[in-house]
């Protein structure tokens, strides 16, 4: 089901990229989210002052809040991977929220975006495991006793691959379902008269889904740091 009107799709059509505009909507709006976040970051970091401005204060509270929550899960040892975890959390939250603006499409409502984020988390999880344990990281997949290894190993492999599917479909399913409801309401009531309760619910869902993705990612990272038993 298509959004009734997508501003940047129309822009790309006007520039002569009709095929790309219709087949890569999620890519276009991922670029929009990236541009928005980069602009916000540049504006916030341009004039850092001892007495913070409103923008600086907002960014400091947001970033420090996410970081301290993550450290409460991973411990101080996990602070170094906050830039990746925090970036994923903020990117997903903004990607979810942007779909509430008439004429915009949430990139997370396309399965490609959640899948890409999930693959990044999957790869980085095992990077952490290898970084902390080296070749001994394989023990995470072999179980507590050696003679159960032939049984435990394939189960662990399937479990880790299932994490990608879990992260992907949880985020995609919720955002696609909400987007479909919004599309119907926009068509029935007009782009600027969608019922406010649904919009409020959309804001709640956007933050909850970003938080769940972030929390699960951090838990996977923390698990990779732990020693196998």
Swiss-Prot record:
Q: GO MF annotations for this entry?
A: proton-transporting ATP synthase activity, rotational mechanism
Q: One GO cellular component term, please give it.
A: plasma membrane
Question: Is-annotated flag, keyword Cell inner membrane?
Answer: yes
Keywords attached to this Swiss-Prot or TrEMBL record, sorted alphabetically, are:
ATP synthesis, Cell inner membrane, Cell membrane, CF(0), Hydrogen ion transport, Ion transport, Membrane, Transmembrane, Transmembrane helix, Transport
Entries under Pfam families matching the protein? ATP-synt_A
CDD domains attached to this UniProt entry: ATP-synt_Fo_a_6
Q: Where in the cell is it found?
A: Cell inner membrane
Sorted alphabetically, the Gene Ontology BP terms of this entry are: proton motive force-driven plasma membrane ATP synthesis
TM ranges: 25-45, 58-75, 81-101, 110-130, 141-161, 175-195, 196-216
Q: How does it sit in the membrane?
A: Multi-pass membrane protein
Subunit structure of this chain's protein: F-type ATPases have 2 components, CF(1) - the catalytic core - and CF(0) - the membrane proton channel. CF(1) has five subunits: alpha(3), beta(3), gamma(1), delta(1), epsilon(1). CF(0) has three main subunits: a(1), b(2) and c(9-12). The alpha and beta chains form an alternating ring which encloses part of the gamma chain. CF(1) is attached to CF(0) by a central stalk formed by the gamma and epsilon chains, while a peripheral stalk is formed by the delta and b chains.
HAMAP family (UniProt xref): ATP_synth_a_bact
User: What family is this protein classified in?
Assistant: Belongs to the ATPase A chain family.
Function text: Key component of the proton channel; it plays a direct role in the translocation of protons across the membrane.
Protein name according to UniProt: ATP synthase subunit a
Q: What is the name of the gene encoding this protein?
A: atpB
């Amino acid at each position: 089901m298509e959004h009734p009107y997508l501003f940047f799709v129309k822009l790309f059509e006007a520039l002569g990229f009709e095929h790309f505009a219709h087949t890569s909507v999620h890519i276009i709006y991922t670029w929009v989210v990236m541009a928005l976040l980069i602009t916000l970051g540049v504006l916030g970091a341009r004039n850092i002052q001892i007495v913070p401005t409103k923008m600086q204060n907002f960014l400091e509270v947001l970033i420090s809040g996410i970081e301290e929550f993550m450290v409460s899960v991973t411990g101080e040892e996990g602070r170094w991977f906050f830039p990746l975890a925090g970036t994923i959390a903020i990117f997903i939250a903004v990607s979810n929220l942007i779909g509430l603006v008439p004429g915009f499409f949430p990139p997370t409502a396309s399965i490609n975006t959640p899948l890409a984020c999930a693959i990044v988390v999957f790869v980085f999880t095992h990077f952490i495991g290898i970084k902390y344990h080296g070749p001994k990281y394989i023990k995470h997949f072999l179980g507590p006793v050696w003679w159960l290894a032939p049984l435990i190993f394939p189960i662990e492999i399937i479990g880790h691959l299932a994490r990608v599917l879990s992260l992907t479909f949880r985020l995609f399913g919720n955002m696609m379902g909400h987007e479909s409801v919004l599309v119907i309401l926009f068509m029935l009531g007009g782009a600027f008269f969608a019922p406010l309760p649904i919009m409020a619910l959309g804001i709640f869902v956007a933050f909850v889904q970003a938080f769940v993705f972030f929390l699960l990612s951090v838990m996977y990272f923390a698990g990779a740091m732990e020693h196998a038993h």
